[in-house]
């Protein structure tokens, strides 16, 4: 299972850059999801993390296809309701395109529109969406049975829930507050990374 870390749009550029650089070796992908920041601020963030040695192949630009193209980042995440994957692929066929979905119908539609994968959530109740009940691992399982592209699960992901998500068929997990709201982001990322490695080891036995 892949481990995706998603920025939470709550930190100044310099602090966020330090966290990203610190956790880069513990995660598979880092999604830049800074919706309140200007293009100039996001470009400054990218400059800082490139200087810090981040592997550009690990970066996913959420929503800002323009910045991805300008910065030669080849992975983009399209929010629900934005451009369709098919529209983006027609113009920029080199991009690897994810689509955020919240239902079985949206997941099926994303596959039809040529998304490379879907980000489904929120699976469990989460601090990011307080008061909203999670959509559950049962729906996650239903989606996996209906589509053939990878499904990344997001929402309320904690290390002790990863087995349930794996059993439902998820190809990876995405974590926002569990890492970026932690007082110790590196140790938080390591807890997820260790749990995933432990699960892979058990499967190999």
Swiss-Prot record:
Q: What induces it?
A: Strongly repressed by thiamine.
* Residue positions of the active site: 122 (proton acceptor)
Q: Which Pfam families match?
A: TMP-TENI
Domain of life per record: Bacteria
Q: What EC number(s) does its UniProt record assign?
A: 5.3.99.10
Q: Which reaction does it catalyse?
A: 2-[(2R,5Z)-2-carboxy-4-methylthiazol-5(2H)-ylidene]ethyl phosphate = 2-(2-carboxy-4-methylthiazol-5-yl)ethyl phosphate
Explain what the UniProt record notes about the effect of disrupting the gene for this protein: Inactivation of this gene causes a delay in sporulation, but does not affect cell growth and the production of extracellular enzymes.
UniProt keywords (A-Z) are:
Isomerase, Thiamine biosynthesis
In terms of Gene3D superfamilies, this protein maps to: Aldolase class I (3.20.20.70)
The Gene Ontology biological process terms listed for this entry are:
thiamine biosynthetic process; thiamine diphosphate biosynthetic process
What is this protein called in UniProt?
Answer: Thiazole tautomerase
- Species of origin reads Bacillus subtilis (strain 168)
Organism phylogeny: Bacteria, Bacillati, Bacillota, Bacilli, Bacillales
